[in-house]
Amino acid sequence: MTEYLLLLISTVLVNNFVLVKFLGLCPFMGVSSKLESAIGMSMATTFVLTLASILSYLVNQYLLLPFDLSYLRTMSFILVIAVVVQFTEMVVQKTSAALHRALGIYLPLITTNCAVLGVALLNVNEKHDFIQSAIYGFGAAVGFSLVLILFSAMRERLAAADVPLPFKGGAIAMITAGLMSLAFMGFTGLVK
């Protein structure tokens, strides 16, 4: 049980996919201008990352490895992710049309979010079992969501702040992301 908790904490804080591994930067910068969109994207990404991580593990263990098809791993994981994203998009469209409109193009772009594929591939490389794969996927999603929501809240405050003209927009966003990354470096010694 302790091993699973350490894996979760490590994935969320110490080895954050956005700030440490630099995966998922496109939605991190693209959806973070409004807090409401960031929360919606976080929920959708959490669902997709967790489910895709579990399904990728199952596809790898019960389809690719037994038939010696490991060379198709990346392509099959992309297919699994695309199916999960389409399912998520249908659910979001049925449950919240406003959220579906707010997320716009970013919801289908979860398919190409490198963090989702990165989690699936790292699960295989780190030889996680089923429970570890689920926890790793969920932890990566929670870490992504945490950073996205915090960054979005900071960007909303920066939009209202008196920022010098050369730093407005993307420049101050990159500086803020760098400072967030430095703050998360404080968690480095937390899990060994």
From Swiss-Prot:
Ranges that cross the membrane: 5-25, 39-59, 65-85, 102-122, 134-154, 171-191
What compartments host this protein? Answer: Cell inner membrane
Q: Please tell me which top-level EC class this enzyme sits in.
A: translocase
| Cell membrane in keyword set | yes
Listed A to Z, the keywords are: Cell inner membrane, Cell membrane, Electron transport, Membrane, Translocase, Transmembrane, Transmembrane helix, Transport
What is the predominant subcellular site recorded for this chain? membrane
According to its UniProt entry, the function of this protein is described as: Part of a membrane-bound complex that couples electron transfer with translocation of ions across the membrane.
Gene that produces this protein: rnfA
One Pfam family it belongs to: Rnf-Nqr
Lineage here is: Bacteria, Pseudomonadati, Pseudomonadota, Gammaproteobacteria, Alteromonadales
Q: Belongs to which family?
A: Belongs to the NqrDE/RnfAE family.
This chain belongs to the protein called Ion-translocating oxidoreductase complex subunit A
The EC designation for this entry is: 7.-.-.-
Q: Which domain of life is it from?
A: Bacteria
